[in-house]
Amino acid sequence: MSTEARDTIFIGKKPLMAYVTSTLIQLANIPSVNIKARGLSIGRAVDVAQIIARKTENAGYSIGEIKIGSESLESQDGRTRNVSTIEIEVKRNQA
């Protein structure tokens, strides 16, 4: 498994706490994790990052770099659509 795959959590339709738990497990092993989402899942990605940063503040996690953008995707009817994307870095604070 590549480093890119291990340090990235893709947000979908699972319960919010499933993504929070997955991110915290990854942060126990590596110093930073990227949370990625697109379209309607962007709000969930922001919620995951905020839960980790605010609720585990004493554990030493913070939000790092945030990247926003868009991707062109072809819809089922053959038209090209632009879909918004977000990537949020959550990292362990240095002791």
From Swiss-Prot:
UniProt record, GO biological process: chromosome condensation
Domain of life: Archaea
Claim: Acetylation is one of the keywords in the record: yes
One Pfam family in the UniProt entry: Alba
Subcellular location: Cytoplasm; Chromosome
PTMs per UniProt: Acetylated. Acetylation at Lys-13 decreases DNA-binding affinity.
Keywords: Acetylation, Chromosome, Cytoplasm, DNA condensation, DNA-binding
Listed GO CC annotations: chromosome; cytoplasm
Residue positions, PTM N6-acetyllysine: 13
One MF annotation (Gene Ontology) recorded for this entry: double-stranded DNA binding
HAMAP family xref list: AlbA
Role played: Binds double-stranded DNA tightly but without sequence specificity. Involved in DNA compaction.
Entry similarity comment: Belongs to the histone-like Alba family.
Full protein name: DNA/RNA-binding protein Alba
Organism: Nitrosopumilus maritimus (strain SCM1)
